[in-house]
């Protein structure tokens, strides 16, 4: 009877040991490692089993076995050694061990299993989330966009297929990658068009700058004319040159004329220059014995670009110098004149100048001799334009002038220029 009870207890212990082995195998499969397990000392179990039936009863045997299990030393063994008696017998009895799971209640054992399972699941989800984060970093990201795990997997698959397609296009069947063709012609055409556009803008700005500079120059000259307008009332004394003519000061000549008619500063008009400027000064020969020979007749030719310039008859005084006053674009002389006049007329060719000299010589001869005989002109002067010298010192001079006019009209015919001044000019006689 006692031995049967001991056999039942041994079966209970062995069953508990196998139960622990299955639990430990489950923990090892989940990656938790060795689990500390407490097993009763094998010697105490053997002594309890080999006790004689006459000494101890069933109750005393159970108490002995329980007391032997409680008082025996505990040891921590790996799960692989559970259920192996020889290894348990050779363990050191000096190492203490915690309570065995067999001594715990079922609720605590189930709670421990749940904690182990939760830890394993947590580690598994962390590894999965880390993989999805890595895939999300490779995908193109938009601001504020949130993707689920399924969307991340779908976009990753699409990107992989797209990259595989590009790889097939870039690498032909031979395995050598294609060389990228640079669109040099297209870029060159764009650059040429841009250069042409910039050149057009530069030319436009340059033309505008030149126009503005010319306007600034004209405004400066106009300002200079207004500042020198106070000098218009002051008399201007022409300077006598070596050839018997008179010239105006260069400063007055440059400021008295209007701005469009003024020449460049490098070359200013002078009255004695007959080749470079339209203003020419011609001297008429007079009688060497007359008192008017000191102020002989001189003809000024203004530039042809002055249609509104007035024709002025100037009578110089016997005593030089002659004072000329100019107050506007038209020329005038306030000083009294009594000798042969100085006539401003339009510019004529050189042969016409010879005709003027011939006519002036005839007038001077008529003035000195007192007759009014017509003067015959050379035949080589026919067909050219001519002008006349108007003098009013006496009636004889007027008759001689009429004779010269009739002779010129007879020689030139229809080419004769009327004696009256043009409509744009005015003749003013200053006495």
From Swiss-Prot:
GO MF, one annotated term: protein dimerization activity
SMART domains per UniProt: HLH
Compositional bias of kind Low complexity: 274-291
Domain of life, source organism: Eukaryota
Localization terms from the record: Nucleus
Transmembrane annotation, as ranges: none
Keywords: DNA-binding, Nucleus, Transcription, Transcription regulation
GO cellular component, as recorded: nucleus
GO BP: regulation of transcription by RNA polymerase II
Tissue/organ expression: Expressed in the pharynx, nerve cords, the H-shaped excretory cell, vulva muscles, and the anal depressor (at protein level). Expressed in the intestine (at protein level). In males, it is also expressed in the spicules and hyp7 cells of the hypodermis (at protein level).
Pfam family, one: HLH
Residue segments, region Disordered: 88-109, 226-311
All copies of domain bHLH, residue ranges: 112-163
Sequence ranges of Polar residues compositional bias: 91-103, 226-241, 248-257
UniProt KW DNA-binding keyword: yes
Function: Transcriptional regulator. Component of a feedback loop involving atfs-1, atgl-1 and hlh-11. Binds to the promoter of the atgl-1 lipase to negatively regulate the expression of atgl-1, and thereby promoting fat oxidation in response to mitochondrial stress and mitochondrial respiration in the intestine. In addition, functions with atfs-1 to maintain lifespan. May have a role in fertility and in positively regulating body size.
Record's protein name: Helix-loop-helix protein 11
Gene source species: Caenorhabditis elegans
């Amino acid at each position: 009877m006692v031995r049967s009870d001991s056999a039942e207890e041994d079966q209970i212990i062995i069953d508990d040991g196998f139960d622990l082995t299955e639990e430990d195998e489950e923990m090892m499969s989940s990656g938790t490692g060795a689990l500390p397990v407490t097993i009763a000392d094998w010697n105490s179990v053997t002594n309890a089993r080999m006790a004689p039936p006459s000494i101890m009863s069933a109750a005393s045997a159970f108490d002995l076995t329980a007391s032997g299990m409680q008082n025996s030393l505990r040891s921590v063994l790996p799960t692989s050694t559970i259920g192996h008696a020889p290894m348990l017998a050779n363990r050191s009895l000096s190492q203490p061990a915690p309570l065995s799971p067999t001594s715990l209640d079922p609720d605590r054992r189930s709670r421990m299993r749940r904690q182990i399972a939760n830890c394993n699941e947590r580690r598994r989800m962390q590894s999965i989330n880390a993989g999805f984060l890595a895939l999300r970093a490779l995908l193109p990201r938009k601001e504020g966009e949130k993707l689920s795990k399924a969307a991340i997997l779908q976009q990753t698959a699409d990107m992989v297929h797209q990259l595989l397609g590009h790889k097939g296009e870039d690498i032909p069947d031979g395995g050598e990658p294609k060389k990228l063709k640079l669109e040099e012609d297209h870029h060159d055409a764009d650059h040429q068009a841009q250069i042409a556009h910039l050149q057009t803008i530069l030319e436009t700005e340059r033309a505008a700058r030149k126009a503005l500079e010319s306007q600034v120059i004209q405004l400066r000259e106009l300002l200079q004319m207004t500042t020198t307008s106070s000098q218009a009332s002051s008399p201007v004394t022409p300077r006598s040159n070596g050839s018997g003519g008179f010239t105006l000061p260069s400063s007055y000549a440059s400021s008295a004329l209007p701005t469009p008619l003024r020449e460049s500063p490098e070359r200013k008009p002078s009255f004695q220059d007959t080749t470079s400027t339209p203003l020419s000064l011609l001297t008429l020969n007079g009688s060497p014995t007359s008192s008017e020979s000191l102020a002989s007749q001189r003809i000024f030719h203004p530039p042809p670009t002055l249609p509104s310039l007035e024709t002025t008859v100037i009578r110089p005084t016997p005593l030089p110098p002659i004072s000329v006053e100019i107050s506007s674009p038209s020329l005038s002389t306030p000083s009294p004149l009594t000798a042969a006049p100085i006539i401003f007329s339009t510019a004529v060719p050189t042969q016409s100048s010879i005709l003027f000299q011939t006519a002036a010589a005839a007038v001077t001869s008529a003035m000195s001799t007192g007759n009014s005989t017509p003067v015959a002109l050379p035949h080589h002067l026919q067909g050219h334009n001519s002008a006349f010298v108007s003098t009013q010192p006496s009636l004889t001079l007027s008759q001689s002038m009429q004779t010269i006019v009739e002779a010129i009209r007879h020689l030139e015919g229809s080419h004769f220029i009327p004696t009256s001044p043009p409509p744009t000019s005015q003749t003013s006689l200053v006495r």
